[in-house]
Amino acid sequence: MSNRDLFAELSSALVEAKQHSEGKLTLKTHHVNDVGELNISPDEIVSIREQFNMSRGVFARLLHTSSRTLENWEQGRSVPNGQAVTLLKLVQRHPETLSHIAEL
């Protein structure tokens, strides 16, 4: 393990941030496209699960969630959070993703 001088690194970062805010330093920036809000319908969730011919319990276990949560998503009683929607969309577009998840 390397010995880092965290205080020096933090001090340097603060100086750079101050210089940047004063227009004296141009920091490297990245532009990220706004992907918008991801949505998924209950029918889509059911369709994804049925695409793999899996029971609710097995599919939920692979997604690292409870079967009750998956049931609520499928019946529209609750809405999956952004991470869950992203994972479901990824599995929908790239079915091999599910086998990679199963290896975790």
Curated annotation (Swiss-Prot):
| Membrane-crossing segments per the record | none
Induction notes from the record? Induced by amino acid starvation and the protein synthesis inhibitor chloramphenicol.
The HTH cro/C1-type domain is annotated at 45-98
Per UniProt, the keywords (alphabetical) are: DNA-binding, Toxin-antitoxin system, Transcription, Transcription regulation
UniProt DNA-binding residue ranges: 56-75
What Pfam families does the record point to? MqsA_antitoxin
* Matching InterPro entries: Cro/C1-type_HTH, HTH-type_reg/antitoxin, Lambda_DNA-bd_dom_sf, MqsA/HigA-2
Please give the Gene Ontology molecular function terms for this protein.
DNA binding
Query: Where does the source fall among the domains of life?
Result: Bacteria
Q: What SUPFAM superfamilies is this protein classified in? A: lambda repressor-like DNA-binding domains
Q: What else is known?
A: HigB-2/HigA-2 has been shown to stabilize plasmids very efficiently in E.coli.
The UniProt function text for this chain reads: Antitoxin component of a type II toxin-antitoxin (TA) system that counteracts the effect of the HigB-2 toxin. Binds to its own promoter and regulates transcription of the higB-2/higA-2 operon.
**Protein name (Swiss-Prot/TrEMBL):** Antitoxin HigA-2
Q: From which organism does this entry originate? A: Vibrio cholerae serotype O1 (strain ATCC 39315 / El Tor Inaba N16961)
